[in-house]
Regions:
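N-terminal leader/linker segments that precede catalytic domains of diphosphate-processing enzymes
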Residues: 1-216
Length: 216
């Protein structure tokens, strides 16, 4: 059984009612993991994600474990979809970028607004999968997104997909589950602790994340 690798994903929503949209893209057919499936931008947590960015703000609201996952989610969203979640920065104080994602924020005069992220929940890939991930999902407000979504080598058909009156049929169970949770958080109707979505004995299970999260 492969050990799941830490990963992170960002659910970006904008609009209301029938104009509600989510940022998503389709994984290429030639990849090993979830080919042809629509997903939110995201990917594995890399070692550099443990280090604070020069251009981040509000990180204390997350705690160390969620902070590095949040960095990974925002970095992957930039790499896969070409957009940044943040807010305009104040006067520059000679900050230096160590990584491409920091440079992207600096060039656009933005701050990575970690305090605008809401923790949605965690999902673990089934044990029979050849590639397994322990993924933490975050919710972000699409009104604070800078840039135009664009397809990359990692995601195709990247755009704001309408979900106000229909669901993307290509979404997997876990994606639909986390989207429903994100919508509940956005609408103020979510209850309980952040959920843990996993599989046991070939059945879908939903537990509670017992990390550093707090009740909503």
């Amino acid at each position: 059984m492969a050990r799941p690798r830490d990963a992170a994903s960002l659910i970006l929503l904008r609009g209301e009612g029938k104009t509600l949209e989510v940022l998503a893209g389709r994984r290429p057919l030639n990849v090993r993991f979830m080919p042809g499936v629509y997903v939110f931008p995201g990917g594995a947590v890399d070692p550099p994600d443990r280090l604070a960015w020069a251009i981040e703000a509000g990180t204390a609201t997350l705690g160390p474990r969620l902070a590095r996952s949040a960095r990974a989610a925002m970095r992957e969203t930039w790499e896969e979809a070409g957009v940044l979640l943040g807010r305009p920065a104040g006067p520059s104080s000679g900050l230096a970028a160590r990584t491409p994602i920091e440079q992207a924020y600096l060039e656009r005069g933005l701050v990575a607004a970690m305090d605008r992220l809401i923790y949605v929940g965690r999902a673990i890939t089934p044990s029979h999968s050849p590639r397994r991930f322990n993924t933490r999902f975050f919710l972000g407000d699409g009104d604070h997104v800078f840039g135009t979504p664009a397809a990359t080598e990692e995601l195709e058909d990247v755009r704001w997909h309408p979900i106000g009156h229909e669901r993307l049929e290509s979404f997997r169970d876990v994606t639909r589950f986390m989207l429903a949770r994100a919508l509940a958080l956005r609408g103020g109707t979510a209850s309980g602790m952040a959920p843990l979505f996993y599989w046991a004995k070939n059945a879908r299970r939903v537990g509670i994340c017992r990390e550093a999260e707090t009740p909503v």
